[in-house]
Amino acid sequence: MIKSEVLSGSASKTVGNSISNGTTVSTQNQGGKQNLIRQQQQQQQQQQQQQQQQQQQQLKHRTALQNYHFASTSEEILKKYSKYPASMSLHIFETHYRFNNSQDSQVIPKDSPMIKDFMKHVLKEQIPVEMCELIKDFAIRPYDGCIILQVYDHRNMVKTAVLQNRSTSSPSKDQDKKQQMVVSKPRTYRTLLRPTSLSIYYDLLYHTDSALHRFTDYLSLQMESEILTATNRELNLSVPLNPYNYDHLRPEPEPSGDMSQNSDEEIDQVKFQHRDAVEQPRRKIHQDEMVLHKSSEYEELMLLLSNKHKRPDDCSDKRLVVVSTSALPGSSLTGTSNTSTGTAAATPTPTSTTASAASQSSKQTTADGASTTDTKGKKGDKANGTSANQASASPTSVHPPIPTIPQNSVRATGQFMRLRLIEEIRKKRELEKLQQEAKIQAQANAIQSDSVPPSQQLAPQNTINSPVVTEPTKRSSPAAQNQPAPKRAKKETKKQLQAKAQAQAKAQAQAKAKVQTETPGPTPVQGQNSLSGPSVVNGSNVTSTANTPTMNNQSSLQQPSQASQPQIGSLNNNQQSQSQQQQQKNPQQTLQQQQQQQIFQNSLTPEEQKVYKQIQQNMATLAMMGQSGVTPTGQQLTPQQKQQAIQQAKNLQQQLFQRFPLYFQRMKQLQLIHQKRRLQQQQQQQQQQQQQQASNSSGGNQNNSSNQAAPQTQQFNQALPSTSEQSKPVTTSPEVKKKRTYQKKKNAPAN
């Protein structure tokens, strides 16, 4: 029993201890939570107090800014900085001026124009522009962008009392005695110099020029802020409201009595009458360009030969080659030079022979590498030589000289090259019209001279060692001189053809009338046995050996009749047309080579040109090896090696096409254009030949009469002695085809 009670008592004690411990832990937990809550509340209160303080400070700052008054006038700025030292000082004396009144400062005389100008700026309260650099160099301190100038006037001295401290001589006494002294000082006053727009500009220039660093955005903004604070103080940075979006904020105006009565009537009325709207048609792009030509051929050639596709590394010596054959001055000049050399050969003067030799030597031009300036210079030499020939051949000609076109050796390339070329083409066409009119006039004069009787045409030939010149050549020389030989045969207008036909009809009628009245007979020519030089027929200097056969009508040229003159004129025209065709070939070939060279230079760079030439040279050697079967060293090739060489040449050709497609495309376009031109020239030549044949068909009766007179001339030629035939070189003339009227006969050989 005792043990059980003891055990129960101990158990109750342990239970009581555990209960007391649990209560103490719970009370501690509750106290910790309360402390945390209190701390959080205190923190929240502190944050609220801080926010309130910040708001109050912001409100105070706003009110301070709103109530802050910027010093804008000169008096306000001077009052604001009255306790600060002045920016600079000026001392005025009786005889001179001085800045800062130091030993280093120079004495400025009273008559100096500089001080007069400075005093004008002081009166205007402006900073002198000339002082902008000095202000920065001497570190003059500005105040709100202005300069405070303190003036000391030594002319008006003011007496002021100054306290002076003096110590006693006895060491026992430490008291200082103060004594007043009267000192005269100059009168002083301050003034303000404000910046001007020009001084601000010079200030900015000084900063940007002298600064080694870049003009950064920070520096620009800082300068802008200083300028704004110095010039415009009260800034309104609020965004203006849109009146259309804020109609409700607009105050309503108080209506007056008169306006209230008429308000309803004026609502529907239009106060301002505007003019009627007009719709203007829009212009197309590039409508204002000066386009005088309409041919697409010209456009294609200009695009091919234009300098827009040139590489930047190309040299500037390459010039533009003009392609238009009908518009070039070289076409007419070369034609006239060649024809005039033929006519000038009829005269026996030595100057004509030398000039013709010079013109023949100038015709030879190199096939490759000929630049445009060289060819133009040679054409100019030809034109000069032919003008000298014309002057020596016909000194008594009455016809006015045909105006020539000045050729520029160098053509300027640039943006306005196309307009310049168009203007030149227009001028050349006008000159061609003038030349055509001169040609028609010369032909009319030649037809009128055909009506002269044969007795006046023949002149005694007593000179020895001189060529025989027939009268038809003399008559045709002025016409040939004034008649230009264009490079490209052109269509004649209907009016010109009608005028020609009428003139020929009149000449034929006169010839028929004179044939009926006069009987043609053989007239001996004087001086026939003394011939030793070459004979000139129809304006062409043609020499031949004694073995060459001669034409039948050529032997009868020494006794011309009126019936055979139209036929000779037609032969002369045909010979001139043939000479024109021969003259056209060489210039066209050189021009085509120039165009190809220009395209080659414009399409390829110098490095590409070298590569192209190397590949082309290799391809040519391989092709020659494949065709001949011999290497350049002289070794023979087998058939398989020949095929390999040909295949390699084809591969190189394909490689050229692949590497330079632009060049081959342009060359193909150029060939197509030249083919079109050749077809056009052939068509025009055929049309001209048909017109000439139609005009010559009307003179068939005259040709029959000339055929009847042929046996008489043959008998006359047989009657001549054989010595004259041996001494005279036989002349030949080119064969000309005629319809049913022309018969070829050979002279009987002399025994």
From Swiss-Prot:
Q: Upon deletion of the gene, what happens?
A: Impairs proper nucleus dividing and distribution to the dividing cells. Leads to hypersensitivity to amphotericin B, fluconazole and caspofunginreduced; and to reduced virulence in the C.elegans and the G.mellonella infection models.
Region span, Disordered: 1-42, 164-183, 328-411, 445-597, 681-751
- The residues that cross the membrane are none
Role this protein plays: Component of the transcription regulatory histone acetylation (HAT) complex SAGA. SAGA is involved in RNA polymerase II-dependent transcriptional regulation of approximately 10% of yeast genes. At the promoters, SAGA is required for recruitment of the basal transcription machinery. It influences RNA polymerase II transcriptional activity through different activities such as TBP interaction and promoter selectivity, interaction with transcription activators, and chromatin modification through histone acetylation and deubiquitination.
Q: What species is given as this protein's source?
A: Candida albicans (strain SC5314 / ATCC MYA-2876)
A Pfam family it matches: Spt20_SEP
Tell what triggers its expression: Expression is down-regulated by flucytosine and upon adherence to polystyrene.
Q: Where is the composition biased (Basic residues)?
A: 737-751
GO MF annotation, one: transcription coregulator activity
Compositional bias ranges of the Polar residues kind: 7-38, 387-397, 445-468, 475-484, 517-553, 716-734
Q: Which keywords does this chain's UniProt record carry? A: Nucleus, Transcription, Transcription regulation, Virulence
Q: Where is the composition biased (Low complexity)?
A: 331-374, 496-516, 554-597, 681-715
- State the name under which the record lists this protein: Transcription factor SPT20
Tell me where in or outside the cell this protein is found.
Nucleus
Q: Supply the InterPro entries for this chain.
A: Spt20, Spt20-like_SEP
Family per similarity comment: Belongs to the SPT20 family.
Cellular component aspect of the GO annotation? nucleus; SAGA complex
A Gene Ontology biological process in which this protein takes part is: regulation of transcription by RNA polymerase II
Which superkingdom is the protein from? Eukaryota
Oligomeric state and partners? Component of the SAGA complex.
